[in-house]
Amino acid sequence: MSDFKTKIFPEPELEFGDQHHHPDPRLGLLQAGPLQTNLGDTIKVGVVGSALTVEKSGEFLNAIEDGFEGKTEKHPNLHPDFPGLRNQNPYRCRFEMVAAEDGVLTKGQIEKIAKEPSDARAVEMAVDAVMAQLEKLEAHHERPDVVMVSLPVKLIERVWRNERARDDEVIEDEAADAKAGRETSPNFRGLLKARAMDLRFSIQIVWEGHFNPD
């Protein structure tokens, strides 16, 4: 029996502006900015969500514009200072919320998804509803550069409920589940990311609790 030799390759550091390298993406951005800076003066941010989460997302962006200090002195690397969103931030540009009125999911849409008894159908309905708003932003005269999908609590509880169950137990054979008549539902996050790939901007899913602790 021959010996099997193993080797651990060092993890490459991330590259930032001015050929700066750093293992931590947050500290690297803070010290040198991105490898390629934004070509304009402003990064336009769109938001899709309920009327409340769209409003709170705008308030959150305004609140963090001037930056804030890190949480703790004991572990500064875990919670570094946040430099803010003005021109001197690491991205060398401003962040501006645009087309806020065009990304709102109606209360009726959210209620209908929340009350849908089928997990699979609820996920598909939620993705369809979000995609409709993303496509409106895509066609807007102020098309955003990035869009926050700010999910309200009611949608999070509905479309993530079955995913939490999947994390707790390994489903070895979904084909067997389908054959036995047991419903297999799609992954909301994966389905939305796949559907949004053709859009001309990036999306980031954000939970309501991140900017609306109440």
For each predicted feature, which ranges?
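Long, low-complexity, intrinsically disordered terminal regions
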Residues: 1-214
